[in-house]
């Protein structure tokens, strides 16, 4: 009998997100610089005869009654690819807001793949895991390794980055859930006119240099998300007004936003100020980068 295996499902933050156009296959051509927070969900896998999933934690209620879940889909696909007959009792501690632009479901699915390969003692290899991840969703592959990276294409092209300056993030969500599909519909991206080139490298330099580059790159999903949920603008403004904030922006398709800070003390003070002014908000502080 193998003991339980627990994996962290860390929040994915899109520091930049460019939508270059809609591809012929229906997917959008993207370029995004992503980092991973220290906070996130937790997934535990235990031996069992059948596959089953229990969800607990602050945001568990948002997943109750789902007929299918990315975690279970990941487990079934891994079992099919490896031919394993074992089951597993999966417990997901849901600490991240649902439908919030920080890759929670994708990170959970990736954590399930990591946990179950260990629990079942299988080694499907990178090619198989990448194929499963791509079938589950555009963000699952980058969440498998949960490392700072530039990702592009529909999420299948990933270049790890190890030399970003270290910084601190305050993550803030005012209790808004946004459908990724709805945000893309509102964006109404034009068809991709030509095969895009690879993204330009992140220029080396100081944290101030990085913040200036991030500001210029932007998040193309922020305007359509603001149209659907104007309250996101209030979250961004509140972050931007905190002392030491170098950049305030929405992550992914929203509605979670982040503030970027040079020092831990600045980030923690900002979170305290925001919590006092907005006691209902979800707030997390995390290091990222270097």
Swiss-Prot record:
The active site is at residues 12, 139. HAMAP family: IspE. Its EC number is 2.7.1.148. Pathway: Isoprenoid biosynthesis; isopentenyl diphosphate biosynthesis via DXP pathway; isopentenyl diphosphate from 1-deoxy-D-xylulose 5-phosphate: step 3/6. Keywords: ATP-binding, Isoprene biosynthesis, Kinase, Nucleotide-binding, Transferase. Gene3D superfamilies: 3.30.230.10, GHMP kinase, C-terminal domain. GO terms for biological process: isopentenyl diphosphate biosynthetic process, methylerythritol 4-phosphate pathway; terpenoid biosynthetic process. The keyword Kinase applies. It comes from Parvibaculum lavamentivorans (strain DS-1 / DSM 13023 / NCIMB 13966). One of its GO terms (molecular function) is ATP binding. This is 4-diphosphocytidyl-2-C-methyl-D-erythritol kinase. It catalyses: 4-CDP-2-C-methyl-D-erythritol + ATP = 4-CDP-2-C-methyl-D-erythritol 2-phosphate + ADP + H(+). It holds the Pfam family GHMP_kinases_C. Belongs to the GHMP kinase family. IspE subfamily. InterPro entries: GHMP_kinase_C_dom (IPR013750), GHMP_kinase_C_sf (IPR036554), GHMP_kinase_N_dom (IPR006204), IspE (IPR004424), Ribosomal_Su5_D2-typ_SF (IPR020568), Ribsml_uS5_D2-typ_fold_subgr (IPR014721). ATP binds at residues 97-107. It is an enzyme of class 2 (transferase). The keyword Iron does not apply. Catalyzes the phosphorylation of the position 2 hydroxy group of 4-diphosphocytidyl-2C-methyl-D-erythritol.
């Amino acid at each position: 009998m193998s003991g339980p295996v627990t994996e962290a499902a860390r929040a994915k933050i899109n520091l930049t997100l460019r939508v270059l156009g809609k591809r012929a296959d229906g997917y959008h051509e993207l370029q995004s610089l992503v980092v991973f927070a220290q906070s996130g969900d937790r997934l535990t896998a235990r031996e069992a005869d059948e596959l089953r999933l229990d969800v607990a934690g602050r945001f568990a209620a948002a997943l109750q009654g789902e007929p299918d879940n990315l975690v279970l889909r990941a487990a079934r696909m891994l079992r099919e690819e490896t031919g394993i007959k074992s089951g597993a009792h999966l417990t997901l501690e849901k600490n991240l807001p649902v439908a919030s632009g920080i890759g929670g479901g994708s990170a959970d699915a990736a954590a399930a793949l990591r946990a179950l390969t260990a629990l079942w003692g299988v080694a499907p290899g990178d090619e198989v895991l990448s194929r499963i991840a791509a079938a589950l969703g555009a963000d699952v592959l980058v969440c498998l390794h949960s490392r700072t990276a530039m990702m592009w294409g529909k999420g299948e092209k990933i270049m790890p980055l190890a030399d970003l300056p270290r910084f601190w993030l305050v993550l803030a969500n005012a209790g808004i859930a946004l459908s990724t599909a709805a945000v893309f519909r509102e964006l109404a991206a034009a068809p991709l006119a030509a095969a895009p080139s690879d993204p330009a490298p992140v220029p080396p330099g100081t944290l101030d240099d990085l913040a200036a580059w991030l500001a210029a790159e932007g998040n193309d999903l922020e305007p359509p998300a603001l149209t659907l949920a104007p309250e996101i603008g209030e979250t961004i403004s509140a972050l931007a007004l905190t002392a030491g904030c170098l950049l305030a922006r929405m992550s992914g398709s929203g509605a979670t936003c982040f503030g970027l800070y040079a020092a831990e003390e600045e980030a923690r003070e900002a979170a305290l100020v925001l919590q006092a002014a907005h006691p209902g908000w979800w707030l997390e502080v995390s290091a990222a980068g270097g």
